[in-house]
Amino acid sequence: VLRIKRLGHSGTLDPMATGVLPVFVGRATKACDIIPDRRKVYTAGFQLGVSTDTLDSTGKTLKTSDKAVARADLECAKSSFVGDIMQVPPMYSAIKVNGKKLYELARAGKEIEREPRAVHIDSIDIIEYDEASRRGVMKVDCEKGTYIRSVISDIGEKLGCGGMMTSLERSYSGGVDIKDCYTIEETAEICEQDKLSQMLIPLDRAFELSLIHISEPTRLQLIS
């Protein structure tokens, strides 16, 4: 689309996810590995009462529950997952175990024990929730490495009914807000008009820290 040889990106998105994925152009690609992209903000749709093998609506249903869940109970349950917590990563993830990605093992019908990992969640806000259908939308402000699918599934398990993610949008990542982003289609149209420079964000916008310390070899690499 951009017709530029040097491109890079920071982070990845789940197959069903949309939203912010910072793309680096030209010399800015040298900063891909040092961008402080710890903070992520997501808006996720969820359905309580259904558990799947992928922890989202793309997977195979494993169990269902008719248990009613009041909003007050949901608010209470989600508060247990705010702060520093231990989270078991889903089988359908890119984490490697003995050289194999977990999703490769999962697709082969294998499930292995996963060690819980330390993650940090700043806040979980229930934006919408319908008690009749037990469907809703939540906003999660967290650090890199947090699986939103697991957050929803774990909340569902705590409520005794299970839960799955139905949609996911990343609205913030590494200093970039979704309001400053473009879709692939919009990018293609802008490039056709030869106006790429109008959509580029200065590299320093991606650094959320006022000062970052780097080694001398790294400095020389960045300015070369």
Which ranges hold each PLM region?
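Extended alpha-helical targeting/anchoring segments
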Residues: 93, 97-122
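Long, charge-rich intrinsically disordered scaffolds of nucleic-acid metabolism proteins
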Residues: 76-102
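Glycine/acidic-rich beta-strand-loop module
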Residues: 6-36, 104
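A structural signal for short, well-ordered beta-strand segments
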Residues: 44-46, 124, 138, 168
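The conserved catalytic core of RNA pseudouridine synthases
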Residues: 1, 22, 112-145, 149-160
